[in-house]
Regions:
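Short acidic/histidine- and often glycine-rich active-site loop of Leloir-type glycosyltransferases
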Residues: 96-98, 286-299
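A short, active-site helix/loop in glycosyltransferases that binds the activated sugar's phosphate group
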Residues: 116-161, 168-169
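Conserved donor-binding/catalytic core segment of Leloir-type glycosyltransferases
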Residues: 165, 169, 177-212
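Nucleotide-activated donor-binding/catalytic signature segment of Leloir-type glycosyltransferases, i.e.
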Residues: 227-249
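Aromatic "clamp/platform" in nucleotide-sugar-dependent glycosyltransferases that forms part
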Residues: 263
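Short hydrophobic beta-strand element within catalytic cores of glycosyltransferases
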Residues: 279-283
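Conserved acidic donor-binding segment of nucleotide-sugar-dependent glycosyltransferases
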Residues: 298-306, 314-320
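A charged, aromatic-enriched C-terminal amphipathic alpha-helix characteristic of glycosyltransferases
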Residues: 320-352
Length: 356
């Protein structure tokens, strides 16, 4: 059996490391570590990727590509010519378009074309949630599109798909439920510029902190430069930059609730990690968030302030016993439904099915 796999990604992230970890236990995984976020590097990256593929296609069992984009086109094309199976993993922004918010890869005509070509050429799509395939969008009242998902934007796409959710390790993300601070709401948003403030719901977190002054709101993942732009902030809102997972768990261990008020999400990792630490989820009705939360927390149907304020008051009136129960349920749901072993099993099934 051929044991070599190519794994392509546009930038390195912790959730990619998890994939590489379990794949490397069974296969020899070869990666190409280019960062495609700098537009000035697009053409040089294409050249480097072409050379990489020429050198590594021989003897390759399969190619995995995280997200659709410029970086997924050449691997998909190479797979089509050589017969090597190519699996693209749509993760969020590569399935949505919000022109009014300057968000979503599919709002850009050229990027959208490369994504469409990639999705057409590849063997199978492995989205992290069904909402990225096709879903109604009702969260924003003035949304650009009534639906989101790659089958909405590419209605003629014939490539099959299989949903494989992100996976998490309950043994690593764990905390004592007795160590929670009352009325504490942690929010996590990897944000370096003002555009992300609206996308990730940071604007709503700030409003909530101003209104509910007896609550505390740790906000993790905001760059120092953006923090300065947002200042002054309410005294009960503490801003932290991106941090190690160990420090992050320390903050999760103290927080009673976790806020995920994004206007668009794929399958939010931080939400699940917080739930494993017994944080009660409070999340917007977008992407995978409602199905992740289910009956373990609170789904926010709209960002409209009157509704949000009333909903938040209801959340604060939840009794201590009920809060404890919800925290336990939140951890159990992620541990049962989204265990890393499930993702590993699904990927290995697909790779083991390949002839040869």
């Amino acid at each position: 059996m051929n044991r070599k796999i190519l794994y392509i990604y546009p930038w390195k992230a912790a959730f990619i490391d998890k994939d590489l970890d379990f794949l490397s236990r069974r296969y020899s995984v070869v990666t190409l570590g280019h960062d495609w976020r700098d537009k000035r590097r697009t053409l040089p990256n294409f050249l480097k990727q072409f050379i990489f593929l020429c050198r590594n296609m021989a003897g390759t069992r399969a190619i995995l590509v995280m997200f659709g984009g410029y970086w997924s086109f050449l691997p998909a094309l190479a797979g089509k010519f050589t017969g090597v199976p190519v699996y693209i993993i749509p993760g969020g922004t590569d399935c949505v378009s919000f022109p009014s918010l300057n968000y979503g890869s599919l709002r850009k005509p050229v990027m959208r074309t490369f994504i469409r070509w990639s999705y057409q050429l590849c063997t199978k799509l492995l989205p992290v949630d069904e909402s990225l395939v096709l879903s109604d969008y009702t969260y924003l009242p003035d949304a650009d599109h009534p639906k989101q998902g790659f089958r909405y934007f590419f209605p003629g796409l014939l490539t099959p798909h299989r949903v494989i959710h992100n996976g998490f390790d309950p043994a690593f993300f764990t905390a004592d439920p007795a160590g929670k601070k009352e009325n504490s709401f942690i929010a996590v948003a990897h944000a370096q510029e003002m555009q992300r403030v609206r996308i990730k719901g940071i604007d709503l977190v700030i409003l909530l902190a101003k209104r509910f002054t007896h609550c505390t709101f740790p906000l993790v993942g905001v760059s120092d430069s953006l923090n300065r732009e947002l200042s002054p902030l309410p005294s009960n809102l503490s801003v932290y930059p991106w941090m190690s997972k160990e420090k992050f768990i320390g903050h999760l261990a103290e927080s009673r609730f976790v806020l995920q008020l994004s206007v668009s999400e794929g399958f939010p990792n931080a939400l699940c990690e917080a739930m494993l630490c017994h944080c009660i989820p409070v999340g917007s009705a977008v992407g995978a968030i409602p199905s992740i939360i289910a009956d373990t927390g609170f789904v926010i149907a709209s960002p409209e302030w009157e509704y949000l304020e009333k909903r938040f008051e209801e959340i604060l009136h939840t009794g201590a016993e009920e809060q404890h129960r919800l925290g336990i349920m939140a951890r159990n749901r992620v541990a049962d439904m989204y265990h890393i072993s499930r993702r590993e099993k699904a990927f290995l099934e697909i790779l083991d099915e390949i002839p040869g």
